[in-house]
């Protein structure tokens, strides 16, 4: 990996990584490559699922097109609706179904006491889709990511949180929303069978991103 970085093409991502140094000297760029490549697979999954959501929800698609049209030229556009769509795809279908945590203090539960230092598995699929707590558990709600309400809901952990938060959160949101904007700027996307859902129906509890099929046609000018 080090040899590949040393001969990386100028202007490439590999060249940028090779020139990036850790101020403390504790992290070598070549040691990060495998981790980032391994961790990028969920980035593709959330992008495909978000495209399925936007393709099947005309209101969100229209809002996304309007924000793309209003984006100033000359730099990366702000795409809040598309970013929110990506975040909502991670709420509906978390790429990490279980989070591993450790309790920091003795805790009293209905069934007994939990000692500090106990390992816990947090089921994100259950927390994100708890229909006893939220009426819209199985429906698309991008606005909760725009008005700040999702950030205040500690049960929503699309990119984990605390010291274990995903360091690639902003990179995934940027790349995924940019890919969606590029696809939707000049094209109309339609979700094709075998998957089928729409804005009026409850969204499925499971969605295999690599089984999704889309039809693309040129959007009207």
Q: Which sequence ranges carry the predicted segments?
A:
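Cytochrome P450
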Residues: 1-221
């Amino acid at each position: 990996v080090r040899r590949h970085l040393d001969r990386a093409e100028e202007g490439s991502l590999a060249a940028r990584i090779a020139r990036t140094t850790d101020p403390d000297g504790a992290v070598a760029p070549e040691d990060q490559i495998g981790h980032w490549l391994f961790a990028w697979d969920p980035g593709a999954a959330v992008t495909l699922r978000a495209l399925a959501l936007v393709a099947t929800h005309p209101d969100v698609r229209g809002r996304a097109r309007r924000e793309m049209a209003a984006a100033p030229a000359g730099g990366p556009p702000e795409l809040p609706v598309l970013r929110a769509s990506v975040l909502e795809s991670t709420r509906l279908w978390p790429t990490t179904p279980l989070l591993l945590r450790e309790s920091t203090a003795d805790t009293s539960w209905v069934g007994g006491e939990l000692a500090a230092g106990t390992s816990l598995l947090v089921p994100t699929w259950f927390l994100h889709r708890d229909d006893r707590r939220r009426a819209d558990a199985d429906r698309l709600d991008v606005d909760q990511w725009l008005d700040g309400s999702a950030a205040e809901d500690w049960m929503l952990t699309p990119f984990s949180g605390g010291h274990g938060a995903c360091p690639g959160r902003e990179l995934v949101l940027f790349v995924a929303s940019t890919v969606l904007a590029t696809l939707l700027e000049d094209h109309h996307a339609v979700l094709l069978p075998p998957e089928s859902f729409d804005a009026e129906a409850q969204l499925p509890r499971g969605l295999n991103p690599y089984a999704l099929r889309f039809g693309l046609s040129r959007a009207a000018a």
